[in-house]
UniProtKB/Swiss-Prot annotation:
Residues 129-178 are annotated as: Disordered. Keywords: Angiogenesis, Developmental protein, Differentiation, Disulfide bond, Glycoprotein, Growth factor, Heparin-binding, Mitogen, Secreted, Signal. This is Vascular endothelial growth factor B. Residues 129-139 have a biased composition (Basic and acidic residues). Homodimer; disulfide-linked. Can also form heterodimer with VEGF. Abundantly expressed in heart, brain, kidney and skeletal muscle. Disulfide bonds join C47-C89, C78-C122, C82-C124. CDD domains: PDGF. The gene is Vegfb. Its main location: secreted. One of its GO terms (cellular component) is extracellular region. The keyword Glycoprotein applies. PROSITE patterns: PDGF_1, PDGF_2. The keyword Secreted applies.
Length: 207
């Protein structure tokens, strides 16, 4: 190949490389990145079945094996935004899909099947409010211990206990005075006086 032809080919390749080189967003003020239209953004974000990755360890619910291949799968589950914070995206239609999973339990391995739930229809519905009100505490009445041997104790509900009986405090100066019943109880009667006289005469005669 002649040197002139080689130069022409090199110039052509350089021009082709320049035209195919990616243009940076900072190369010119007129360059604009592609903007996703609002209608597409809204459509992608709405509540609908979408492909999500689910770890198989969560689906086994306690059935443990050494290793699962793959360790996670993709299924259609409900997800997306709702127009109100009080709503949530929930499934209204679901079905079961069976998948083959390689279960490795050394030194052997085998193909098994797992049944996974997929969502086919979704809808925004009101969130289930958890009961934030605590149950009322049961009022336990306070019972005073009942004495085992108290004369006249009534075990029926509502009866006054000995601790409930209020003993009035005597007024000042009343402690020296005795009630008439108390004075009568301390003064000897006629029969007691005659008995004392007889006992006195017997004692004198014996002396």
């Amino acid at each position: 190949m002649s040197p002139l032809l080689r130069r022409l080919l090199l110039v052509a390749l350089l021009q082709l490389a320049r035209t195919q080189a990616p243009v940076s967003q900072f190369d010119g003020p007129s360059h604009q990145k592609k903007v996703v239209p609002w209608i597409d953004v809204y459509a992608r974000a709405t509540c609908q079945p979408r492909e999500v990755v689910v770890p198989l360890s969560m689906e086994l619910m306690g059935n443990v094996v050494k290793q699962l291949v793959p360790s996670c799968v993709t299924v259609q589950r409900c997800g997306g935004c709702c127009p109100d914070d009080g709503l949530e995206c929930v499934p209204t239609g679901q079905h079961q899909v069976r998948m083959q999973i390689l279960m490795i339990q050394y030194p052997s391995s085998q193909l098994g099947e797992m049944s996974l739930e997929e969502h086919s229809q979704c809808e925004c519905r009101p969130k289930k409010k958890e009961s934030a009100v605590k149950p009322d505490r049961v009022a336990i009445p306070h019972h005073r211990p009942q004495p085992r041997s108290v004369p006249g104790w009534d075990s029926t509900p509502g009866a006054s206990s000995p601790a409930d009986i209020i003993h009035p405090t005597p007024a000042p100066g009343s402690s020296a005075r005795l009630a008439p019943s108390a004075v009568n109880a301390l003064t000897p009667g006629p029969a007691a006086a005659a008995a004392d006289a007889a006992a006195s005469s017997i004692a004198k005669g014996g002396a």
